[in-house]
């Protein structure tokens, strides 16, 4: 699932949730820790703008978030 892929990519980048949230906030995407946690556990839908920002933060292609879904 997308949330698990986001978490896996975050771990691979050796970033904490707080670090990712800080980077998102600097990019103009306001997000709380609880909201981010919901994204990683698929309890909340992610916006395309958030996926694009995460791809930049993780230095990866947006398609990486969809790995194993098809």
Model-derived segments and spans:
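A short, Lys/Arg-rich alpha-helix, primarily the initiator
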Residues: 1-13
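Short alpha-helical DNA-recognition segment
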Residues: 15-38
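Short amphipathic recognition helices of helix-turn-helix/homeodomain-type DNA-binding modules
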Residues: 64-70
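The alpha-helix within a helix-turn-helix
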Residues: 10, 21, 25, 55
């Amino acid at each position: 699932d997308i949330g698990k892929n986001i978490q896996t990519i975050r771990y691979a980048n050796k970033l904490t949730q707080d670090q990712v949230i800080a980077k998102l906030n600097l990019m103009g995407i306001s997000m709380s820790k609880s909201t981010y946690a919901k994204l990683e556990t698929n309890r909340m839908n992610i916006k395309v703008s958030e996926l694009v920002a995460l791809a930049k933060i993780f230095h990866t292609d947006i398609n990486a978030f969809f790995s194993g879904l098809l």
